[in-house]
Amino acid sequence: MLTVATTPEQAKQVISEWKAQGLTVGLVPTMGYLHEGHESLIKRAVAENDRVMVSVFVNPIQFAPGEDLETYPRDFEADKRLIEGAGATLVLHPEPADLYIPDASTYVNVDGITAELCGKTRPTHFRGVCTVVNKLMNISQADRAYFGQKDAQQLAVIRRMVRDLNMNVQVVGCPIVREEDGLAKSSRNTYLSAEERTAALVLSRAVAEGQRLMEAGERSAATVLDAMKQLIEAEPLARIDYVEMVSWDGIKPVETVDGPVLVAMAVYIGKTRLIDNFIFGE
């Protein structure tokens, strides 16, 4: 039986009952329009915790003006079916006014690690992400929180926030879930036309090319990135936002691979911005 909480207070009431029984709690934060990638996070959380809270909340403060806040896909009825089927028992689905009181003036900034990759072109994005995730961790009193590697920089940023603020929660990163043809599953894939959907495969092909080169011994970032960029630029519908290699622990640009690295990209296919990545040497 799935309990739907629409306010933090309702969720906290359920959580306090769980905690009183000594139960462990897993948290899966989402923006809804759930797919098999989210489902894999929920199932892992269910396997590793006594109870699981999933949040479904399109977080307005992580969108900049002109981004897709208003058009971001929503289908809460379908989300509820997937959440219940995956075994979670609590979903928090608040309105923005329920999570952010009108005179709220506290935000969570993680500096440095947010300056590269998505943070370059979306400078306020991670402030919004960290603020809402911090709130959800507080509401849920989670023992573990689950995030997909598709948003690899987000995963690194949240780990840093939890470390720096001595938060009592384990951050669990989970593998990217892909379509059969390799495209990373994303709620934004629904924006793509049939032609764009085919063109979008250039991201996973670039990932495969980068992995192939590095597994064959290539350690020059420029060589790997140039090969990936050439592949993407050959697709007429693709426009590169960034293709970069950074250290996995500090998200700082590297020239030569001598430790774990994140190779990440953001690419516009038509008007839709898609991301993909791989981690090497972890």
Residue ranges and their predicted role:
Residues 227-282:
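Phosphate/ribose-recognition catalytic cores of enzymes acting on nucleotide-derived substrates
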